[in-house]
């Protein structure tokens, strides 16, 4: 140690006497390091031929009766490991990544320019598909005293786009969307103003260069093509159906008012003002209230029985004294909104198990409303925590949550739970939902480039076998398993959610379940305006998935359970 210190002192004194040599050597050292760093930047990852790829992709075995399922037991990092593990890596300079003929196809500008050009073309095609969902009508006069579109409105002086306005109006069930001042969006069921010259609509959208968003007191108006569920709305109110008058009207619907000039919006506005979630139109009378056991809204009647025209709006139906037209207002039913952690640590761990894309997040929302307790998760998703799932941050074994979300399969993971609700969904729908989540978020959409590119076929090849093994594993290794089909939950939420609450050991309260029915969508439903315009499944994909469906159906029936719904397709 003393010798080393002595040598260091000699070097220090030497360079102190000759500083020029010191800085020269330092500059040479830094230059050499920079060259090594720059050289490492030329390392690429060329595509590996199919013959060299990992065989763990789970491709069907030729000549076999059923497709090969493989050992697809994924851990907590399942979202990232599937793709990473299936590709072998090779490193080398980029000029060896492609042969001469392949590089020639890229032109003089190389791959980066081609990718940028391709991305622009894809974005233009996506925009064209979005525009097909709405037809431009024209430029219309607008006045603050007498609006052309008299529904809801919202403003965004930084990020307003045509599609954003259309999407918001479509979600609320309006037929028309109009943009003004480059940043204002108005919705309505009819245009109540005159058409003017197109040159008057000359203001660019604040969030989209090159797009027109009206002008000064001028609206750029679009006619929307609504999804089926959106078409059953009236502005911000949701159409619930035609129902027979309840036996004890004053108890079922406690607030009533006579309206000689009845219209849907007048009754909805009255009940909204009185803070009731239901508006029932009965000819010239408007009734307001909550869904209760006296008026549960479960037995719908033929809409022709409610087809009496409104006195103030000839194109609207206002029901009769015996048959009510019912709308749900935007007033929140607070009877099922309180949530908390379990007061004492639970002795049982109950899983809410599903394949990704099968509606687990939605089911958690329903369970929290129905029980009043937070649900937990085997994972952690910050975006879900920010949306109100406060149990997301708890460890899954904490015992403070009513059940635990999990996508796990495999004996060890399953046997860690004392019981499970197994949520099963049509694989065709589940795969598409998970693909949208993966590339677009919980309520977003994957871009058309992802559907048309290599991502979708690879996704189906990896995830379709897992849809089957996930269900089979839970049926085999689960201690107590309640099977709930996503489609049944949507169609008969009251009954199916009651079954789920019973398994969780919580008393079933009918009024609370009725409250959940009116809040069932939450903030976890994708927009109705933007839909995929074609079937992404090839004939080969459908044959493979059909075999998995038959396998799961057989397993369910062998345990005296209901088989998969008929909507899954031929078996």
UniProtKB/Swiss-Prot annotation:
<feature type="domain" description="WSC 1">
    <location>
        <begin position="133"/>
        <end position="225"/>
    </location>
</feature>
<protein>
    <recommendedName>
        <fullName>Sialate:O-sulfotransferase 2</fullName>
    </recommendedName>
</protein>
<dbReference type="GO" id="GO:0000139">
    <property type="term" value="C:Golgi membrane"/>
</dbReference>
<dbReference type="InterPro" id="IPR027417">
    <property type="entry name" value="P-loop_NTPase"/>
</dbReference>
<feature type="glycosylation site" description="N-linked (GlcNAc...) asparagine">
    <location>
        <position position="195"/>
    </location>
</feature>
<dbReference type="Pfam" id="PF01822">
    <property type="entry name" value="WSC"/>
</dbReference>
<keyword id="KW-0333">Golgi apparatus</keyword>
<dbReference type="GO" id="GO:0008146">
    <property type="term" value="F:sulfotransferase activity"/>
</dbReference>
<comment type="function">
    <text>Sialate:O-sulfotransferase that catalyzes 8-O-sulfation at the Sia-glycan level using 3'-phosphoadenosine 5'-phosphosulfate (PAPS) as a donor, forming 8-O-sulfated Sia (Sia8S)-glycans. Displays selectivity toward glycoproteins such as TF/transferrin.</text>
</comment>
<feature type="transmembrane region" description="Helical">
    <location>
        <begin position="21"/>
        <end position="43"/>
    </location>
</feature>
<keyword id="KW-0677">Repeat</keyword>
<feature type="topological domain" description="Extracellular">
    <location>
        <begin position="44"/>
        <end position="571"/>
    </location>
</feature>
<dbReference type="InterPro" id="IPR002889">
    <property type="entry name" value="WSC_carb-bd"/>
</dbReference>
<keyword id="KW-0735">Signal-anchor</keyword>
<feature type="glycosylation site" description="N-linked (GlcNAc...) asparagine">
    <location>
        <position position="248"/>
    </location>
</feature>
<keyword id="KW-0325">Glycoprotein</keyword>
<dbReference type="InterPro" id="IPR051589">
    <property type="entry name" value="Sialate-O-sulfotransferase"/>
</dbReference>
<keyword id="KW-0472">Membrane</keyword>
<feature type="domain" description="WSC 2">
    <location>
        <begin position="236"/>
        <end position="330"/>
    </location>
</feature>
<keyword id="KW-0812">Transmembrane</keyword>
<keyword id="KW-1133">Transmembrane helix</keyword>
<feature type="topological domain" description="Cytoplasmic">
    <location>
        <begin position="1"/>
        <end position="20"/>
    </location>
</feature>
<comment type="similarity">
    <text>Belongs to the WSCD family.</text>
</comment>
């Amino acid at each position: 140690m003393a010798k080393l210190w002595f040598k260091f002192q000699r070097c220090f004194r030497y360079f102190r006497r000759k500083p020029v040599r010191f800085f020269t050597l330092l500059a040479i050292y830094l230059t050499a390091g920079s060259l090594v760093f720059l050289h490492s930047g030329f390392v690429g990852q060329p595509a590996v031929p199919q013959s060299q790829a990992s065989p763990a992709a789970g491709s069907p075995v030729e000549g076999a009766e059923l497709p090969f399922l493989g050992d697809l037991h994924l851990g907590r990092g399942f979202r990232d490991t599937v793709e990473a593990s299936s590709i072998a890596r090779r490193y080398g300079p980029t000029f060896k990544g492609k042969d001469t003929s392949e590089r020639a196809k890229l032109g003089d500008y190389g791959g980066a320019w081609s990718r940028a050009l391709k991305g622009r073309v894809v974005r233009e095609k996506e925009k064209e598909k979005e525009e097909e969902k709405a037809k431009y009508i024209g430029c219309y006069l607008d006045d603050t005293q007498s609006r052309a579109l008299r529904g809801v409105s919202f403003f965004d002086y930084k990020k307003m786009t045509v599609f954003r306005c259309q999407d918001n109006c479509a979600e609320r069930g309006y037929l028309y969307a109009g943009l003004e001042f480059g940043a204002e969006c108005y919705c309505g069921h009819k245009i109540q103003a005159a058409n003017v010259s197109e040159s008057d609509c000359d203001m660019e959208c604040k969030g989209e260069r090159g797009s027109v968003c009206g002008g000064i007191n001028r609206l750029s108006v679009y006619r929307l093509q609504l999804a089926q569920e959106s078409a059953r709305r009236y502005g911000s109110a949701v159409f619930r159906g035609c129902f027979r008058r309840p036996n004890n009207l004053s108890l079922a619907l406690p607030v009533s008012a006579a309206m000689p000039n009845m219209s849907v919006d007048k009754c909805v506005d009255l009940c909204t003002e009185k803070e009731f979630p239901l508006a029932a139109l009965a000819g010239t009378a408007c009734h307001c209230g909550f869904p209760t056991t006296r008026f549960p809204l479960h037995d719908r009647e033929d809409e022709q029985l409610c087809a009496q025209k409104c006195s103030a709006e000839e194109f609207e139906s206002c029901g009769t004294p015996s048959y009510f037209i019912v709308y749900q207002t935007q007033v929140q039913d607070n009877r099922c909104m309180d949530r908390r952690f379990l007061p004492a640590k639970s002795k049982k761990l109950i899983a809410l198990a599903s394949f990704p894309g099968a509606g687990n997040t939605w089911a958690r929302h329903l369970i929290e409303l129905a029980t009043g307790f937070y649900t937990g998760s085997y994972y952690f998703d910050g975006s879900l925590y920010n949306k109100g799932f406060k149990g997301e941050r708890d460890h899954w074994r904490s015992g403070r949550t009513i059940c635990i979300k999990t996508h796990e399969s495999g004996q060890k993971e399953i046997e860690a739970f004392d019981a499970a609700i197994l949520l099963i969904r049509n694989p065709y729908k589940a795969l598409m939902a998970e693909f949208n989540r993966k590339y677009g978020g919980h309520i977003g959409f994957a871009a058309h480039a992802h559907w048309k590119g290599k991502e979708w076929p690879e996704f189906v090849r990896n995830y379709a076998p897992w849809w089957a093994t996930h269900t089979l594993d839970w049926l085999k290794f689960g201690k107590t398993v309640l099977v709930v089909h996503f489609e049944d939950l949507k169609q008969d939420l009251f009954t199916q959610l009651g079954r789920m609450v019973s398994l969780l050991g919580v008393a079933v309260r009918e009024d609370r379940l009725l409250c959940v029915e009116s809040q069932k969508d939450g903030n976890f439903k994708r927009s109705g305006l933007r839909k995929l315009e074609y079937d992404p499944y090839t004939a080969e994909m459908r044959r493979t998935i059909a075999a998995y469906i038959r396998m799961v159906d057989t397993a369910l029936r062998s345990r005296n359970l209901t088989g998969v719904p008929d909507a899954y397709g031929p078996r």
